[in-house]
Amino acid sequence: MKKKICVSAVCFAMYAASCMGQVVQNDGFAQLCEVYRHATMTLNKVKTVDESGSALDSLALLLRNNKDNPAILQVLRWSYDTCPKEKRGAYEMALREQAEMKDAIKRLAMSGALQSEKIGTAVNQFAKTFAIRDLVYDERVGNEGAPAETKKARDKRMKWWRDGKFGMFIHYGLYSGLAGEFQGKQYEGCVEWIQMQSGADFETYKKEAIPRFNPKSGKAAEWVKLAKEAGCSYTVLTSRHHEGFNMFETPSYSFNVKQLKGIDVVKEYSEACKKYDMKAGYYFSLLDWNHPDYDPSGSGISYPAGNYIAQQQGKREFGHHDRYKKYLSDIFGVLLDNYKVDLVWWDFSQPKFQGDYAWGATHLMKQLFDKYPNAIQNNRLYHSDNHLSEGGIKVTPVWKGDYSTAEHHIPAKGIDGDWEACQTLNGTWGYSASNQRWKTVKELVHELVDVVSRGGNFLLNIGPMPDGSIPKESVALFKGIGKWMKENGEAIYETRANPFDVEFPWGRVTRKGDNTLYLLIYQLPESGKISIPCKFKGKAVATMLKNKQKVALSQSEKECVINLSGMPMDEVATVVKLKGKWESLIQ
């Protein structure tokens, strides 16, 4: 038997080696699956530790000889991790050669090998197909400029963000002073784009916007205080938007709030985050419609028509993009050096204008992680045609950055990996005096619950008025959410996605560990009963989260039924907590 297994091991080694050329050439999903199937098939045939040593030796040899191929490296790692512990033998010893493994991963990160869209997509699809949920592709390895890290290290770094679930987005800039109106015309939609919408050149825009923007000291503290009252765990302020107006002092460039208005808004915001123990995030636009070195030619990036005309008339130089990338790096360095940064929300890229070519992404990431190694970043330093799509909404792959971003959209089935949905209160990010299309507290809580139940975070926006005051409608909505969160936040914070892969007509489900489920009920059926496809092993207790009142629970072979007849229901969303060891009945 031992001799037979050795032959099998050798056959596997030869087969996998022959596959390797295909994987290197195609980085394909099918080839990854074939290698994985043969690896697990070989391992499953062995009966003893000695036999496994022979089989695993062949895997270890593949690992050592092909550690510069990221696809093979990941597949072999999965082969090891899915092998029974008593059968790991020589392979485990090979993986203990830490210096060799670290050097291999470092080389991959430095070379950008894991940047390959084909590799990233294939590996992620591979993991999903085989339901290897606890062994995910290392999204951060392959982000040029970001250090490689283990899954354990990544989980630790991402923990506060994954557990926090709810954040406040704050769009405040020079555009806020215009309040949606420019030269007598009212603009609709996202009015922070008003220069683009109006087509104004830089000089015209400055003349109109600067006098109407009047930031007052102390307003940033009001934003963060409201976020705290609403139950937010983090906030994200626009440190600069596409108009290029910096909301912090930038000594090398005078188009900033400190030099034009005498106040450093980012500084006050940073101090407020510290005061209220709030994680401080910064939106950082990579565009700059008005910087003299910004060159949008041939990029497909939006650009105000007036600036194009000024260039054509010789009144404005065409940009020098290498100098612009240095400018981006310089002002980002100012932000990092002067304010505590927990999160960076980059914006934005296009298929033909992204990454190093467009923004110097490698250097920007290196700046961030050299200064703040535990910082978190979204994925918008890059853009890709090879990304998830649902209903025409495209999402950049998470493996470029720490998390995906869905804007003005909540994906019906969530997004693989870490992700966040950002939403507005009334359809615009910046302040608009005429826009009164406010959502309700109920609608917003349901959006929050929908996102969290699908495994994401929810970033909800406010657009302060010209002086920085928060519109009274925004205050009321955030306080309304805060009231609900104070009573029901346990069903949101530190939870993970609905484990059943189906949604229910009566509401949503979140979970905490493997012994707690939260049923968030939007609409109770006329029967007064709701059901979920699970059964409990041993004792199970159902209670109303708000008042701890016990609820009747019964089980059958197909479902668990909760009877809420006669129970007081929350007009926004009622939460029932189920405590007990459960298992899904969905095959």
Each language-model region and where it sits:
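Structural recognition of alpha-solenoid helical scaffolds
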Residues: 55, 71-72, 100-101
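Immediate post-signal-peptide N-terminus of mature secreted/exported proteins
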Residues: 22-58
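Charged, low-complexity interaction regions
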Residues: 41-52, 64-67, 85-90, 109-118
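Amphipathic alpha-helical repeat scaffolds of TPR domains
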Residues: 33, 70-78
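Bacterial Sec-dependent N-terminal signal peptides
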Residues: 1-23
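Mature catalytic domains of secreted/periplasmic carbohydrate-active enzymes
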Residues: 97, 110-587
